[in-house]
Amino acid sequence: MAAEFNLRPSLTKEMRTNDSWLDFTVGFRTERNTVEQSISFKDGKARVRSSVPAGADVTMIYKDDSVVRDMLRLPPNEVLNLLLKNRFRLEGNLSYMNLFNYYLSLLLGGTQKKMLAKSKAAAVELLARESRDLDPALASEMKERHKKRISATNVDEGVKFLDDPYLASYSLDDFPRLVKFLDVHMTRRPAICHERSSLLTDWFLENGFEVDGEGQPWVPELRQAKAYRYLMENRKPIIHADDLLAGTTTTKEIGVVVYPDTHGTMIWGELVSAGDRPLSPYEISEETRQTLHHKVFPFWSKRNMREWVRSSYDQPLSQRLDERFAVYFMWKTAALSHTILDFPKLLRLGTGGIIAEIDAELAADASASAEKKNTLEAMKICLEGLAAYARNLASQAEADAAAERDPARRAELERLTETLRKVPAGPAETLDEALNAIWLGWIGLHMESTNAGLSIGRIDQWLQPFFAADMDELKTAEEREAYVKRAIELVGCFYMRCTDHLPLIPDIGNYLFGGSSSDQAITLGGITPDGEDAVNDMTYILLKVTEILGIRDPNVNARFNPDKNSDTYLKRLCEVNLITAATPSMHNDLAVMKSLEEFGYPAEDLRDWAATGCVEPTLSGKHMGHTNCMMMNMVAALEMAMNDGHHPLMNWDVGPKTGSIEAGDFATFEDFFGAFTTQLGFLIDNSVEYNNMLGEAHSIIRPTPLLSSLQDDCMKKGRDATKGGAKHNSSGAACIGLADITDSLMVIKKLVYDEERIGFAELKRAVDANFEGAKGLHALVTHKVPLFGSGSAEAVEMANRVAKFAHDAFGAHRNFRGGPYTSGFWSMSNHVAFGTLTGALPSGRLAGKAFTPGLTPEPNASPNLLDNIRDVASLDAHNLNNNIAFNVKVVPSASDSHEQVVEHMFSYVKTYFDLGGMQMQMNVVTTDMLRDAMAHPENYRNLLVRISGYNAYFVTLNRDMQLELIERAEYGI
């Protein structure tokens, strides 16, 4: 390799940035040092050594010699999967590992491309072998559902203009513009866009990052604000053909945004191969490849969140645990975005009004600290940048209108020009203006913060006054009917604009959270801040758009308040869920608010909660909650408790010594339960430590002045949101594997201790052997113990006990911003990823199999859906203050009409909520349909499924995730 890079000019030039050489050293060794080498790239020369120098930038430590051979043969995406499976581990800067993988791909690109093609062909062949003869009509079933719609009579007090709130007379075919946008969404391959990262890097190269042009340390807020303004002033203003909204997140029709100060360099190794990978391939132009490799990534290779913590805290244990992927995954390495902003403020005041508010705050506070003055100045600069982008778009709209030959489109562009000259700089007055202002604000926020979980919030509440004002101006029924149709189309354009970008996911991410988009949650219904029914006209218009488009993002969540909201509304939620197969997610207002009681939030703030990212509650515009700061694999603690602190996959004696099963150290079940909670507490303590370090990193590397300007109290406190400026602060964890842990603990308690039918050492031997040679024991543990979801009060008690420990252990900590930690029980798709990294369990679950999603019971817990419903609803809401994901796969009876199916779904959801259940999401698909989609993905490109908190297109998921969905319990209704 060294010789090739030294002698081939085409490779030698890859060792340069735009103005210097890329100097770094990569070490390679096995755990037992049977192999030890390094390669250095310095001053344009590559050199191999027979040892690893102490100053190596990154060292890859392989499990054995075979992994070294695999490393050199596999394409970059598969190399990262070796890391995920703990076949090798890293010490040092991950950016340089990815740069080295990029160099390998340049050297072996042709071979790797052939390997990827071979891998794809093998997958197709496997599907063909596994598929059986299925009903050809399966592929058309979803289309048929869209043809069946029911009407309703308005009973909701907040609905003023819709005689039929279900809007049953409208279908997608009534909106050719949306049909066109949807086709682009479903057929266009995403492309990596370098615009944002390139412009920001240009500014920092010119003006400095750590110090300014005069050598003085930068105030991070001012540095970020000035770079942001430069970005917004220089972005390409784009208005897509036929769109009613202006502006784009990237320069591509569907663009992948690069955030190099967080996780952007994780794609470095795939700059050549990203277009050929089997899952979620990305287009990447030669210009983008060159820009990222020669300019962007070199600048940020040591200026990102992981590397700031590594250098500041000497690669702490908490960080090393995260980088093994098996026990927890820290989202703050990629984002601090899970929050909801005060969009009503932007609509009410505009950027100009908010700037005036900032000036008034500074004038009123004569003793303002330097921090406050700098923070508020940074907010103003960012708001000016957003307004500048809107002005550029207005000029573009005017130019497009002048060149447009079609009179109807010219009129739309002229109207858009007027709108952009008004908002977001000033207050919005019409629905057109409000949606454009929100969209432009949304673009602006994603130019500052990672597009992962940043959520829109209660958009029906914000838009209703504008819709009502527009309708009040109309005199005839015909005018109002036409305007309702336009409102549907406008909202449809907004939904489709939200699909114009995707998060940057290296191939390893396809296994951790495959199929996920940006998870931009919107929330409908519920109650108002003063406690009244919040369902309104826009609630139903948004539900109509959700129904006809059936797209994965925005992630639609619906609040249902049993005391205030109508059955008509809940039935509509169920009908939309039936037609789309997977959305919206439904939440019990009373249970969610009960879960948050411990924090003493003001009632008006609590009633204004909305879902964030997946399902997590945030108090809209007042709460920096980072509700998905981490994914915690609770099952890892069980494995460590069974192995005296040793983690089997990592082969690491990392946890505290809590006792040996073989030595008979656990005389009682309580002894073992104590060992489990000690290990889980150890993992929680470490995850919190690393999360707090990353929080500090964000405050230094990427404070967020624009976001802070739309977050209550940041202005008054004079403190950025990353430093605790928001009115309410917290951090939320997702605890994964509750049902699997509960079932395993029930097996241990019942069979080992209560009934003494098996010895603990015997059970452990069977678990260690993946139950091979222990069929009788496997049958015993899977059939003779009451499971969570079976209707067993004892199993529910065990689940509550585990959930309470997680809640209390997280709740004992405070985050970097001074707020509490919350605990939720949902999993995105990490129940699959963590499952593949986990051995067999006492419950009988075999090694490598997925955990149950969220806190959904194990598929064989009960053949009766009501048992599942009762057990999940029996969990104590106080322990679930970051919400849950209860996934149910239901299959309508072929003999039932559309109306009857909706009634059945309504009955189950209503019963669950009446019992106190917090959240429910349904996949209304058959196992046969999913199997057919695996075999014939071309027939199911828009088949929507609910994973655990978010939606995905089934055909974009990795095989393990598809099988997990297929293997979920299927209940007839």
What are these regions (language model features)?
Residues R73, K85, A403-R405, D472-E473, ...:
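Charged, alpha-helical scaffolding/interaction elements associated with membrane systems
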Residues E377-A388:
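Extended non-globular scaffold/tether segments
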Residues Y62, N77, A388-A399, Q461, ...:
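Generic structural signal for well-ordered, non-membrane alpha-helices
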Residues M1-R145:
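Feature captures hydrophobic
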Residues A397-L413:
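Short, Lys/Glu-rich amphipathic helical modules
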